[in-house]
């Protein structure tokens, strides 16, 4: 997946629109997320490792909020020959178009059904693995529990949910220091103060992170019997829950 450099917020703008996964973002997304999310490559690679261990023959895998297909590709590499199907969903037409190009660049015997649509409308069944990779945080908070319930219902016993999210902290000093370390990470990756500030403004109304405890309560409340935080770097995390 060749990536152009993200310069979307490099020029000062009097009006910052809410962040959208439009064609501009899709064109630079690989660069944007690598420079913005610490540990992203490790998370993607490990999702493939989880798939190797949890995906059973003749079951389905769901990548909800698949963006350019990084997680889907990681999964597909690990489940060759299992007669499985991956359903990859994103509501951005621009993302889906580029995702299809990325998927087509690699030969695989694993079918991928790529859907441009709302993940809240997707029927989940016979699933051995569901991935929500930095997706839930963009849903309205009041819609999150219903989606988790739908995922739990559609997972087979022993099935796995991988949930990666930016998280917030109730402890103000912890929130402050980890947020500052994340900003330093972005500065070290070449983002200017202007870019950081303008993107923060763009995300303010569309991304609403939860605390880790809220995530755990939501998952266990819907019936998941096993939960663990398996990755955290600053205020970015990835969790697993087993049905």
Curated annotation (Swiss-Prot):
Coiled coil: none
Enzyme Commission number(s) from the entry: 2.1.3.-
Keywords associated with the record: S-adenosyl-L-methionine, Transferase
A GO term for molecular function: S-adenosyl-L-methionine binding
Enzyme class: transferase
Statement: the UniProt record of this protein carries the keyword Nucleus: no
Known catalytic reactions: prephenate + S-adenosyl-L-methionine = carboxy-S-adenosyl-L-methionine + 3-phenylpyruvate + H2O
Keyword field contains Transferase: yes
Protein's GO biological process: tRNA wobble uridine modification
Positions bound to S-adenosyl-L-methionine: 40, 65-67, 90-91, 118-119, 133, 200
Function statement: Catalyzes the conversion of S-adenosyl-L-methionine (SAM) to carboxy-S-adenosyl-L-methionine (Cx-SAM).
Family as reported in the entry's similarity comment: Belongs to the class I-like SAM-binding methyltransferase superfamily. Cx-SAM synthase family.
HAMAP family from the UniProt entry: Cx_SAM_synthase
Subunit structure: Homodimer.
Protein name (record): Carboxy-S-adenosyl-L-methionine synthase
Organism (species): Shewanella sp. (strain MR-7)
